């Protein structure tokens, strides 16, 4: 798949960014007036761990293929997998 043809949509044709926006709105609604802390890091950890888990499944746990798919160094991938206890 070329860079021009890469999809930024979920399986239903909706942009991933739209899904994130909906999830974040719901998160803030559920706070019921409480002040959130460290939202940026929370979102990154939630998204990154899910992304790594799904990509590893798609690559049959082949770290080389997964790192290529993600566009990161294999050593970086291993470090992240260990940090999220996915290895």
Label each PLM-derived region with a short phrase.
Residues 2-18, 22-87:
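Bacterial C-terminal helix-turn-helix
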